[in-house]
Amino acid sequence: MDLVSIILISIGLSMDAFAVSITNGAMISKVTASEGIRIGLFFGGFQALMPLIGWSIGIKFESYIAALDHWIALILLSIIGGKMIYDSIKENRDNKDEIACDYAVGEKKCLNNKTLTLLAIATSIDALAIGVSFAFLKVSIINTIIIIGSITFVICFIGVMIGKKCGKLLKKRAEILGGIVLIFIGIKIFIEHTNILSKIF
């Protein structure tokens, strides 16, 4: 897998965390740079950890399903991407937003570490599934999780900072964009591994 694909996957995966970061930034009473860094570190850390766990699981079964690697990548990325798009257009907010709201408003003026951990886990489950597909692709897992974690950190920091001004609108668009990116990468991997275009043309 090339660097551009890894970066695009990182951006796509980070959109869920970005959306929650915007929600937090829009609702906590005082948004500061240090708060943005703290939130970014939590989300970025878990977003890097989950693919590593998924990769570790997938590598154990590589010999059994290596012939299906492109199908696994396509299916996982498409399901996750489709779910992100579906969730973003639902009328009701999902559980991640409800957790964020519960702790970000009222008497709670900022997010505590326990809440951030729950949010970070909730938004990185998709990355766990993607990590499984990494086991069947030619990627350097260490470099990949560093890129994923770093990009998520930066994007979440930005999300917190701008959440006050355009939280609701940008949150919805971010999830849709993230879903589209993941589906696109899934199709790209499938085409590359099957050489389907060369067979057609």
UniProtKB/Swiss-Prot annotation:
* Major place of residence: membrane
Q: Which gene encodes it?
A: mntP
State a single Gene Ontology molecular function: manganese ion transmembrane transporter activity
Q: Where are the transmembrane segments?
A: 3-23, 39-59, 65-85, 116-136, 141-161, 176-196
UniProt similarity note:
Belongs to the MntP (TC 9.B.29) family.
The protein's name in its UniProt record: Putative manganese efflux pump MntP
- Ligase as a keyword of this entry, yes or no, is no
How does the protein associate with the membrane? Multi-pass membrane protein
Cross-referenced PANTHER family: MANGANESE EFFLUX PUMP MNTP-RELATED
Which is a Gene Ontology cellular component entry for this protein?
plasma membrane
Function according to Swiss-Prot or TrEMBL: Probably functions as a manganese efflux pump.
The record ties this protein, via InterPro entries, to: Mntp/YtaF, Put_MntP
UniProt keywords, alphabetically: Cell membrane, Ion transport, Manganese, Membrane, Transmembrane, Transmembrane helix, Transport
Q: Does the keyword Flavoprotein apply?
A: no
Source organism per UniProt: Clostridium botulinum (strain Loch Maree / Type A3)
Localized where?
A: Cell membrane
Any single Pfam family the record assigns to this protein: Mntp
